[in-house]
């Protein structure tokens, strides 16, 4: 059965991933077209798999058992923000309050990224490679490569890609890894100066980043000015 699926899994994985890379490296307004094309293709392939009995990871099974991991992520987030406050680097999420629509929109985007990584990429790699560890490493590498040339995100998504794939295989729940992705991503965005992570941009957008003055979340701390030279 696995050998019959391998050719289909390979071409679906290749088509979907190539479209994702094209999207990342295409300028606007054409990028929007490729984004929705990639989205439709990936979701279409996953729905085909669902018709064959493959799980999408969108149920609530395993969520409650995995909430301890979310709790750890929240504690690490608070610790990172605490040190960022001490170093006067903490700032708003892309110039918006953390509870603004852009921040919460990132929760949807984070969960969608995990859907692509786990439901689309990892599921197919697990059928293409007999060793689970090989599939996890390849999935994490593909996830990381899509964040080039932002080397901070390349490194962090490689580590998170491995961790999130392991968590997904244990709990089979996308909401858990989506929430953790959101927590860690926002923490990274507000704790590290935008000049370093370029507003978390990847691909062609990384090179179009323009510095702007970040607004501190804690005005009473007298933050150090962030240089944009």
Give residue spans per PLM region.
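Aromatic-anchored segments of alpha-helical transmembrane domains
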Residues: 16-25, 75-84, 140-149, 183-193
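Structural signal for the C-terminal ends of transmembrane alpha-helices
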Residues: 25-26, 44-54, 82-86, 167-170
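Alpha-helical transmembrane segments in multi-pass membrane proteins
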Residues: 2-50, 69
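Interfacial transmembrane-helix boundary/kink motif in multi-pass membrane proteins
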Residues: 1-15, 50-79, 94-102, 128
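Membrane-embedded alpha-helical segments of multi-pass membrane proteins
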Residues: 33-42, 99-104, 108, 112, ...
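Functionally important transmembrane alpha-helices
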Residues: 154-214
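Function-critical hydrophobic alpha-helical transmembrane segments in multi-pass membrane proteins
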Residues: 92-145
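Hydrophobic alpha-helical transmembrane segments
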Residues: 10-14, 67-71, 100-103, 133-138, ...
